[in-house]
């Protein structure tokens, strides 16, 4: 029942992402872009060096980082669980995107930026360029918006899921569960072809209409107890 409610919530957020912005929202967004890169939160998760900051918003218990240019991943890194008792990268990246015709092709970073309330990144391969934006829509969910300069099919997958995490596919959502009770959901629109592959997933978007919207959520099963 809980996951059914979460899927309904994520679909609602995806629909909101597709809808046009109001004039007030547009004004706020324009102001946001006057404060580019006031923080450097570039970090690709590994065991060699520490992370010193995450992008988080709306009172969320999860955070994301921009990938480092020298260790590029074509997706925002995370989510990272900010649980005060058990901090962990739930994935190096829960949603990595590529062109479906050549998923092994290397993407070259063009631009990354932290804005107040938004992460931005763009990269290119020989097949075209892909831009991505990430904004929190609530304490538990962030909306990922993807655009490309070509109508070629896109393919999503996860990169390096965290220790002890089990991945499954339920309807239009990817469910990544940790034994602690923390669960990551990656929710796609109904037209996406979603499949489970080993302990991971693939999501194929055919002839995409941009922007492509994906909801990333981190649910804490014990959250009411922690916050009481």
Q: What positions do the PLM features span?
A:
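Terminal accessory carbohydrate-recognition/targeting modules of carbohydrate-active enzymes
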Residues: 21-218, 222, 226-228
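Bacterial N-terminal signal peptides that target proteins for export
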Residues: 2-10
